Amino acid sequence: MSITKTELDGILPLVARGKVRDIYEVDAGTLLFVATDRISAYDVIMENSIPEKGILLTKLSEFWFKFLSNDVRNHLVDIAPGKTIFDYLPAKLSEPKYKTQLEDRSLLVHKHKLIPLEVIVRGYITGSAWKEYVKTGTVHGLKQPQGLKESQEFPEPIFTPSTKAEQGEHDENISPAQAAELVGEDLSRRVAELAVKLYSKCKDYAKEKGIIIADTKFEFGIDEKTNEIILVDEVLTPDSSRFWNGASYKVGESQDSYDKQFLRDWLTANKLNGVNGVKMPQDIVDRTRAKYIEAYETLTGSKWSH
């Protein structure tokens, strides 16, 4: 069963529909994040979906939240032993009509003030970073060593932020100096240091499992009482990261990936990048789903059972 859009009939107020997530308000301090099976590429949502993708994103995010729990606070509400998320929601949402839309793809989260940056960390040069480097020798305005090849590892992971665009708009790559202007120098520095630390820990873990995390996008909030930075949204999923096959990794070319790159390549080859109303052929749906599942199983060590 594929869920492309949740309909809760006003039981909880809908706060927003993002590219993938439907967000509902549970109470003044709590939100319900529901990961649908929608998939977007080049800032456009495809007409059809990837079955169970939202469940996979949710389970993988939960895995990484736990993995990083000693390194950073996250926005998850603790679910008491023996309870489920439905014990914290209006009873009506346990009815089959609603439960089937929410089960295994929902996170109950604390509300936090969002830091208005897409916090991207790059360990390897690829994508828009590679294109910029070829033209100017820089990445997000930062001078890079000469002679880097496509897909090569940077000497150190780098913080390359972008703006958080409204849906339908494009995120814009900015320099760390511009990020400091947006959110303040101290907060920008703290976010950059934390993001690089989290990425590095996860990159090392994934490498042992045979997956290279080339880059990823974090989002952070701030606890306005304690000034602590909080890890929010999704974490290190195939939607927010580039995952490469470590066994076939080769510097100087594009890589075999477990993420949306496969879909992006198909769109580009068919001159459909950025075009609205695109329906993916079944084989692209199936192969994208298979790549997401392989990434999940490899990283978590758990068999996909849906």
Swiss-Prot record:
InterPro entries: SAICAR_synt/ADE2_N, SAICAR_synth, SAICAR_synthetase_CS
Gene3D superfamilies xrefs: ATP-grasp fold, B domain, Phosphorylase Kinase, domain 1
Catalytic activity, EC: 6.3.2.6
Pathway, per record: Purine metabolism; IMP biosynthesis via de novo pathway; 5-amino-1-(5-phospho-D-ribosyl)imidazole-4-carboxamide from 5-amino-1-(5-phospho-D-ribosyl)imidazole-4-carboxylate: step 1/2
GO CC terms in record: cytoplasm; nucleus
Catalytic activity entry: 5-amino-1-(5-phospho-D-ribosyl)imidazole-4-carboxylate + L-aspartate + ATP = (2S)-2-[5-amino-1-(5-phospho-beta-D-ribosyl)imidazole-4-carboxamido]succinate + ADP + phosphate + 2 H(+)
A Pfam family it matches: SAICAR_synt
Subunit structure: Monomer.
Identification of the protein by name: Phosphoribosylaminoimidazole-succinocarboxamide synthase
Organism expressing this protein natively: Saccharomyces cerevisiae (strain ATCC 204508 / S288c)
